[in-house]
């Protein structure tokens, strides 16, 4: 799946994650201006599609693009 295939609302989340590299839903929300819960929902949808992976550190969950997907975009 290409970035352009994503709906606009999820694409905004994806672009923010690309800028940050690795981020929590709260980090993404600061960039997009949307609620943390909204970003969490979109990030989890992207995880379900195997576009991003989750990394739990303590109580925080960080999201990062899968390496294979990142290579396709470059």
Swiss-Prot record:
The protein's name in its UniProt record: Uncharacterized protein AF_0529
Alphabetically ordered keywords of this record: Signal
InterPro entries in alphabetical order: HTH_ArsR_DNA-bd_dom (IPR001845), Tscrpt_reg_TrmB_N (IPR002831), WH-like_DNA-bd_sf (IPR036388), WH_DNA-bd_sf (IPR036390)
SUPFAM superfamilies xrefs: Winged helix' DNA-binding domain (SSF46785)
Lineage start: Archaea, Methanobacteriati, Methanobacteriota, Archaeoglobi, Archaeoglobales
A GO term for molecular function: DNA-binding transcription factor activity
Organism, scientific name: Archaeoglobus fulgidus (strain ATCC 49558 / DSM 4304 / JCM 9628 / NBRC 100126 / VC-16)
Entry annotated with the keyword Cell cycle: no
Taxonomic superkingdom: Archaea
Keyword Disulfide bond: no
Position of the signal peptide: 1-25
């Amino acid at each position: 799946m290409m970035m352009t295939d994503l709906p606009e609302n999820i694409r905004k989340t994806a672009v923010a994650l690309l800028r940050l590299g690795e981020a929590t839903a709260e980090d993404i929300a600061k960039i997009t201006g949307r609620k943390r819960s909204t970003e969490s929902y979109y990030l989890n949808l992207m995880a379900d599609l195997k576009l991003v992976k989750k990394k739990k550190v303590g109580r925080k969950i960080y999201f990062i693009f899968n390496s294979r997907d990142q290579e396709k975009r470059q």
